[in-house]
């Protein structure tokens, strides 16, 4: 829900596909584009991103500027025109500027009455006056109910990201733990996305790290396999996980079907909240084994109990009276907002995460929280209970909308006493601390950017830094990569990798590889600029055109990059910096190169140098990871490359079915023919390739 800036405030919630009218959005309401160093402590010069938090604080518009009467009158006239045609029924409205950018999306029980409040000549706060002054068009869609309007409003806000709405940022899906249900020996794995595979899903967890740690501990406690089905089917002896007691070895019959089924049941019970009963069962078995002098078995049960205790110790608070709930708390400071979310499922704490929604300074905590909730649950199933730190307007309307989405009752409340109040207070403390850390990190990053600009002689601190590197082994599996950093840290959703495509490259020709990467990147960027799109910011307000391009290499790499930009007519528009490693590749002894300037040497403890090293190392980490994936794929498919008529799709099908190249080689013609997409002729060709006849 996004709070309406007029007399009455709106709420919004996520629209399920079956709750809107048959034509919920008219053709004219299809989504549109949104508008778009010396005193630094060296220890603070590193860019860090907590996986549980957003990486960046949003840009906050200055709402103190007065609005001229002329534009305000024009905007009111446009709104008055819309009022004359507006219905008195529920609906959603959108305000657009002269460039056809959506400024604001709102909903109302009575659209005509709501729009009339904007047409008043006086009584608006500066933020609303600025919005009215920029408005030239108002679009309206009627809905059957106010709840339907609320759902549609939240959906449109997430799609269009209007400037004057509260915007949820970095809204990626949460990871779950899945115990599969489509194999006789269920697998435990991390899952993100649509829950289409049969099995039991547990979560959401606040971060991938929390899921990975929990799965590792669950493997130690319950010995449930984590391997893929194809790997499972290809085993002829137990793998390493069996040897280190993190799997029971069902693949090779080390445990029988009833025994493995019991392990899976215990794991499911533990994740379902019956942890005390599971621990009691294991304790009884440990005592029994000890009494029977089976000390090795008793030690195994002891280790499993310790793994369960480790999981629970990581969860921190585990409420006694709350079975399934999400807890939201908001704290505002310095014009920014932080919403901390805790997830409780089956009476267990599955972690927490901090969000920093984009909202103008004049929004109250209640307004930001209400709008945040609607967008948050747009693509997530709501729990039975939602606890809030602040009372929000139209709380009942939001609860009704979430009930429609979930197909069951959803309660939304701001508790005043008891354990629920304590949970909210704990979340509020975390929100306050998270925002404090983020403000401090942002201030440090700002000083680093200023120091970098001073050191390199830039006209202003860079808003977008791109760093390039490439990786290969004697020219094979060559890949280039670009990472992006801004005033608030790394912007990982804008990282890019480039598979080197040029034929005839001399193996190991780093200059040619860098030229190809930069040509592909800046040709695309120059084309976008010619069309007028390159200057427009992305959703997170980061400009698309870099202020500084850093190349991992010395003067030669720098000249190669400069040549590419000159060929494209961009030589004067991009600042280049080459970073050459020191003697013996020692950190702290790097040399910096810029076109037509003497080499720059910084003191080893200079925070600006440390900052540049961190940027270079992040690019190196990213490109090495991309190269390893390519190499792993190449090694895995080695041996299938030479079979005529077997392309990438069939290779993947064969490897998915058999797991390894050795199993493909062992397969009979009949087994090969069972693979989806492999015809009888292809099966014969594959078999003959691995089993050539005499002569």
From Swiss-Prot:
User: Record's InterPro entries?
Assistant: GIY-YIG_endonuc, GIY-YIG_endonuc_sf, GIY-YIG_UvrC_Cho, Hlx-hairpin-Hlx_DNA-bd_motif, RuvA_2-like, UVR_dom, UVR_dom_sf, UvrABC_protein_C
Where do the record's region annotations for Disordered lie?
A: 1-53
Give one GO biological process term: nucleotide-excision repair
In Swiss-Prot or TrEMBL terms, this protein is called: UvrABC system protein C
Q: Which stretches does UniProt call biased (Low complexity)?
A: 18-27
Task: List, alphabetically, the PROSITE patterns matched.
Answer: GIY_YIG, UVR, UVRC
Q: What does this protein do?
A: The UvrABC repair system catalyzes the recognition and processing of DNA lesions. UvrC both incises the 5' and 3' sides of the lesion. The N-terminal half is responsible for the 3' incision and the C-terminal half is responsible for the 5' incision.
């Amino acid at each position: 829900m996004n709070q309406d800036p007029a007399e009455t405030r709106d709420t919004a919630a996520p629209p399920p596909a079956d709750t809107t009218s048959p034509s919920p959005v008219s053709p004219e309401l299809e989504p549109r584009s949104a508008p778009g160093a010396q005193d630094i402590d060296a220890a603070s010069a590193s860019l860090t991103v907590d996986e549980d938090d957003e990486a960046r604080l949003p840009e906050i518009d200055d709402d103190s500027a007065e609005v001229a009467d002329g534009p305000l009158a024009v905007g009111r006239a446009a709104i008055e025109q819309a009022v004359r045609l507006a219905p008195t029924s529920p609906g959603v409205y959108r305000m657009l500027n002269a460039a056809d950018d959506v400024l604001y999306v709102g909903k109302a029980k009575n659209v005509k009455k709501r729009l009339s409040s904007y047409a008043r000549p006086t009584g608006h706060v500066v933020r609303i006056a600025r919005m009215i002054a920029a408005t030239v068009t108002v679009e309206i869609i009627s809905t059957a109910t106010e709840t339907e309007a609320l759902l549609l409003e939240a959906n449109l806000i997430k799609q269009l990201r209007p400037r004057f709405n509260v915007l949820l940022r970095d809204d990626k899906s949460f990871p779950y733990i899945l115990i599969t249900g489509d194999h006789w020996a269920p697998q435990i794995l991390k899952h993100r996305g649509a829950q289409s595979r049969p099995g039991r899903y547990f979560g959401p967890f606040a971060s991938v790290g929390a899921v990975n740690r929990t799965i590792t501990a669950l493997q130690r406690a319950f010995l449930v396999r984590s391997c893929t089905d194809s790997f499972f089917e290809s085993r002829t002896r137990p793998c390493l996980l069996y040897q280190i007691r993190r799997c029971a070895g069902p693949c090779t019959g080390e445990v029988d079907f009833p025994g493995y089924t019991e392990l899976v049941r215990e794991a499911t019970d533990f994740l379902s909240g019956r942890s005390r009963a599971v621990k009691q069962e294991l304790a009884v078995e440990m005592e029994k084994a000890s009494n029977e002098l089976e000390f090795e078995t008793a030690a195994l049960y002891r280790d499993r109990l310790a793994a369960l205790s480790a999981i629970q110790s990581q969860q921190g608070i585990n409420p006694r009276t709350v079975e399934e709930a999400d807890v939201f708390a908001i704290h505002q400071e310095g014009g920014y907002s932080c919403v901390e979310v805790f997830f409780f499922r089956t009476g267990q704490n599955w972690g927490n995460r901090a969000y920093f929604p984009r909202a103008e300074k004049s929004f109250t905590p209640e307004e930001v929280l209400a709008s945040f909730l609607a967008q948050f649950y747009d693509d997530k199933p709501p729990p039975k209970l939602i606890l809030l730190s602040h009372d929000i307007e139209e709380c009942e309307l939001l609860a009704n909308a979430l009930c429609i989405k979930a197909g069951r009752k959803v309660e939304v409340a701001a508790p005043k006493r008891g354990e629920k109040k304590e949970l909210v207070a704990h979340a509020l403390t975390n929100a306050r601390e998270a925002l404090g850390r983020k403000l401090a990190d942002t201030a440090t990053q700002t000083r680093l950017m200023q120091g970098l600009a001073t050191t390199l002689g830039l006209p202003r601190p860079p808003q977008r830094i791109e760093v390039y590197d490439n990786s290969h082994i004697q020219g094979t599996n060559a890949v280039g990569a670009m990472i992006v950093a801004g005033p608030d840290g790394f912007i990982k959703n804008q990282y890019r990798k480039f598979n080197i495509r040029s034929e005839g490259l001399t193996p190991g020709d780093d200059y040619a590889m860098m030229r190809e990467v930069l040509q592909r990147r800046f040709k695309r960027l120059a084309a976008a600029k010619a069309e007028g799109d390159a200057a427009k910011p992305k959703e997170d307000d980061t400009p698309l055109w870099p202020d500084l391009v850093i190349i991992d290499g010395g003067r030669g790499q720098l000249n190669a990059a400069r040549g590419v930009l000159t060929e494209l007519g961009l030589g004067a528009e991009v600042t280049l910096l080459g970073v050459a490693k020191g003697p013996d590749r020692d950190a702290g002894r790097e040399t910096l190169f810029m076109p037509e300037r003497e080499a720059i040497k910084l003191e080893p403890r200079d925070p600006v140098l440390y900052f540049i090293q961190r940027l270079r190392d992040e690019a190196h980490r990213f490109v090495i990871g991309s190269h390893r994936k390519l190499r792993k794929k190449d090694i895995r498919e080695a041996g299938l490359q030479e079979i005529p008529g077997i392309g990438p799709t069939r290779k993947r099908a064969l490897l998915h079915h058999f797991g390894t190249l050795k199993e493909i080689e062992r397969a009979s013609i009949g087994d090969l023919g069972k693979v989806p997409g492999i015809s009888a002729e292809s099966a014969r060709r594959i078999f003959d390739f691995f089993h050539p006849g005499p002569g």
